[in-house]
């Protein structure tokens, strides 16, 4: 029945609110949690922020496995700080999503049931220390490229969370580069091959 597929007609009041909302975004204003927003905007934000939060939490796992096996005490301390940062990023983002009226339990239920996703890069195993370095240098480097524009997104709580996340991701990228650089410049031929393989 084609009538079932039709969207409901919006009232003049809803159209006026949506025009004012779009004008605020066009002017570069932040939309805050208590501001009126169209339902499709809210749903899109919940989906995007939750996927991002899930990726930060799941992203702790491949590197967390290496905390006890890092090659030096210095590397262990750096990796532990990085894993803690990633957990914090997930928490900042869950808090930003909660400002949209969704609970953390709902977000996690969606992840556990498969209705919500996370970045598939974290499904690849970290078989050796070079894999950990590549995650820091290249995966976190790619994340920075994707996430810096989010510091200027229209939703204020998300944008503010991203400012801190991006600063910390820069540290993560530097530690990944440094770990690989040490392996390439001071490592054995087997370690250099390991970096190339990673």
Where are these regions (language model features)?
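Extreme N-terminal leader/anchor segments
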Residues: 1-37, 75
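A contiguous pocket-lining binding segment that forms or flanks enzyme active sites
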Residues: 157-198
């Amino acid at each position: 029945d084609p009538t079932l597929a039709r969207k409901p007609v919006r009232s003049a009041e809803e159209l006026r609110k949506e025009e004012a909302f779009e004008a605020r975004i066009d002017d570069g204003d932040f939309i805050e949690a208590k501001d009126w927003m169209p339902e499709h905007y809210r749903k899109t934000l919940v989906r995007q922020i939750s996927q991002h939060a899930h990726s930060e939490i799941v992203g702790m796992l491949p590197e967390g496995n290496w905390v006890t096996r890092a090659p030096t005490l210095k590397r262990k301390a750096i990796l532990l700080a990085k894993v803690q940062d990633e957990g914090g990023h997930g928490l900042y983002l869950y808090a930003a999503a909660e400002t949209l009226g969704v609970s953390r339990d709902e977000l996690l239920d969606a992840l556990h049931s498969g209705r919500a996703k996370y970045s598939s890069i974290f499904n690849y195993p970290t078989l050796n220390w070079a894999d950990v370095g590549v995650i820091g240098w290249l995966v976190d480097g790619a994340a920075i490229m994707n996430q810096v524009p989010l510091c200027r997104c229209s939703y204020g709580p998300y944008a503010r969370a991203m400012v801190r996340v991006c600063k910390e991701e820069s540290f993560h990228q530097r530690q990944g580069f440094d770990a690989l650089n040490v392996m390439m410049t001071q490592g054995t031929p087997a370690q250099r091959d390991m970096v190339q393989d990673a």
